[in-house]
Amino acid sequence: PFFIARRYLFSKKKHNAINIISGISVCGVALATLALVCTLSVFNGFQDMVAGFFTAFDPELKITVREGKVFDPHEACIRQVHALSEIDVWTETLEENAMVQYKDRQAMAVIKGVEDNFEQLTSIDSLLYGTGKFLLSDSVVDYGFLGVELISELGTGIQFVDPLQVYAPKRNVRVNIANPTAAFNREYLFSPGAIFAVNQQKYDSRYILTSLDFARRLFNYDTEVSAIEMKLKPGSNIGSVQKKIAGILGDRFIVQNRYEQQADVFRIMEIEKLISYLFLTFILGIACFNVIGSLSMLILDKREDVET
C-alpha cells in the first residue's frame, strides 16, 4: 500500500486541478485538527490556571446554611464535624455587604471577618503586596486588607494614612427620617501596609479581609457566622470527607468543595469549551467532506489504471 500511495502521490497526473484540490483538502483537515487540539489544550490550561487563583483564597471545604445568612457554630452537629480527625484547620467567617468611605470616595464592599488562623487555611501570604504582614487586629485598632481594584476605586493606596470608614445598617432598627445616620453602625479600619490580589474581579474589586470580632461588632452579631471554612490533613480524600460532613449536618447545611464554591465560573468555562469544540468540529467535518470529494475525483481520474 505504501508503494502504491507513493507512486500516485509523486507521479504526473492528467488533471493538475485534482492534485491542487487534494492538497488543499489535506491541509484543511490537518489545520482543523491542529486548531481543535490547541484550542482544547488552551482551555484546559486556562481552567487549571483559574483554579489555581481560587485555590489560594478559597478553602478546601466550606459549610454554609441553606436558608438564611448566618447560623450558630456551637450547635451539636457542628461540634461533631469539628471533632473529625481529617480536619486540620477550622476557621469561622462572617461575610456581609457594607459601604466603605475614604475621604470623599465611597464604594460598596463585602466585609469578610476571619479568625487569626486564616493564613493557615489558605495561601493568603502569597497574595499580599506591600510591606505589611497578615495582621487582622491588635490591642488598639482593627486592620483591613483591601482588594487591589477596590483600593484603586477608593484611592487609598497600599498604605493609607486616614482610617477607612465602614457603614452597615443596624439589625432590627427602623430608619429615622429625621436622623437617618442613627440607623447605621460606623466602624473604622486602618491600613496594615498590604493589600491582596487574587486576579479575580469578584474578590479584587469588592472584598475586605478583617477580624471576625470586627465583623460581628459591625453587623450586630454575637457568636453567629456565615460560613465555616476547613482545610484537611494531607492525604485526606476531599470527596469522602465532604460526604461524611454532609451526612452529619443533614439537609439544613451545604458543604462545598473549591469547584462547587465557584460553580458559575467553571460552568461558563465549560460552556465556552463546548462551543469552541462544536465550532471546530464542524469545520473539521467540512474539510473531511472535501477530502472525500477529492478522493472521488482521484478515483475517476485513475479508473483506467485500476482496470488494467
Predicted segment positions?
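N-terminal Sec/SRP start-transfer signal
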Residues: P1-T33
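Alpha-helical transmembrane segments
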Residues: L9, I20-I21, L31-P59, S296
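Peri-transmembrane interface segments
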Residues: K13-G23, P234, I238-I292, L298-D301
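Membrane-interface junction motifs in transport/secretion proteins
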Residues: Q47-C77
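A short beta-strand structural signal in non-transmembrane regions
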Residues: L61-V65, E224-Q242
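Short amphipathic alpha-helices in soluble, non-transmembrane regions
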Residues: E75-H82, D125, V241-L249
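A structural signal for hydrophobic secondary-structure junctions
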Residues: R79-L209, D213-F219
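Conserved phosphate/oxyanion-binding catalytic-loop motifs
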Residues: V306
